[in-house]
Structures are given as structure tokens and as C-alpha cells.
């Protein structure tokens, strides 16, 4: 069992809606940033995977909003790889402010041949790198 990946961010003014809360779509942006940073820590570079012939796309995204974030809030996005399938990876994500979960969700990525090809198995190098973040 691995440890979750944690990435810290701060709400910027342009991410808020007229109610002074983070606009809902921005939580998916936060999820994407955290997964990109996990990738950087685990593999060094997303481009290295693409250069070796594999890419990935989001096939499914889900967010549950619990309490709004507001301008200038510091928060963490916590990522756990909850499932590594043959051609897909599911991540569980939590947005935490001061240790309290304010939003949670899942992302399912499907691995494809680089350049827009069809589904392909998760490369062994990627699988091994992600195991330390797997629940």
C-alpha cells in the first residue's frame, strides 16, 4: 500500500465566481494540476512517456462539492491511485483546507497510443512508478 500524493495550492482571484467561491469547473483544473505534479514526481516527465509511444486521456471525471473554497485560501489536493487496470488508471482526489475535506472526486484516465491511437496497456515503467501511490 502506497502513500497519497499531496500538492499545495492557493485560490487566485480569477478562479472565483460572483459569490466569491471557487467556480465549480476549477476543481477539475486543481485535480489536473495535482495529477500532473504526481506524474512529475513519479516519472520525472510526462513527455518521456509520450516520447516512448504512450499517452493518456481523461475518460471520466466526477466532483462532489462539500464546502466552498474562497479567494486566497491555501489548500492541498491529495491524490491516491485507487485502481491500476490493464489500460486505465483511476485516481481518488480530495481537496483539503486545514485538514478538512472541502471537495472530493475521481478521475479515470485511459492509456492510448501517442498521437491519438487506440487504447494500449499501461507501460510497466509507469505501473511500477505509480504503485507507491496506490491504495
How would you describe each model-predicted region?
Residues 12-17, 21-24, 28-36, 64, ...:
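Residue-level signal for functionally critical sites in structured catalytic/ligand-binding pockets
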Residues 2-58, 114-135:
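Hot-dog-fold acyl-thioester-processing enzymes
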Residues 38-88, 102-103, 110:
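Hydrophobic beta-strand-centered segment that forms part of the acyl-chain substrate-binding groove
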Residues 3-7, 68-71, 82-135:
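HotDog/MaoC-like acyl-thioester-processing domains
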